[in-house]
Amino acid sequence: MRERETVFDRIGEEDQVIAFFPCIRFENQIMLSFRGQAYQMRKWTDVQKMEHDMKLLDELNHMYKLVNKLFIVCIRKKIKLIVENPYSEEHFLRRYWCLQPSVIDKDRRERGDYYKKPTQYWFVNRKPSYNFIFETANDNAIPSRGKDAWKERRKADYELTGAETVKVARSMIHPDYANRFIREFII
């Protein structure tokens, strides 16, 4: 018997949860840290790198348990769930998880977002709608500046997203993209 109420106790089969699950330990750049090849680690000793690896692995394990618990609860309670996370071949969930994404959006600019940002979505207890949207998507893309686009991003570029830093700008979703995604896959 559970000791306390959870947020899931008030969510039922008629509800729908959309989760932007933290990706910091699942995304492909984390592999650079595990190998000790991240730029900020260039002067670290092997011992420092290994100690850091153990911490990263603990954090990865914690996040992996959380995402699994979220899915398990929603599957058992028949709660409709949509989870968003970045997509890449090296992404931890893409490589090692038993669930495959329902939708992979390889270029979000085609649906009106600021950046390409390949993204994967898991749909639980429901299927994507795959509605056909007749109007063309607005071109809200912020111009790329080559291979190291994020390093060369100018303040004027990322301020278009409403963000105050380039780090926050990467997480911003253009309202046109959100609207189009909802109409195409959810409604």
Please name every model-derived segment:
Residues 1-187:
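Conserved active-site and SAM-binding loop architecture
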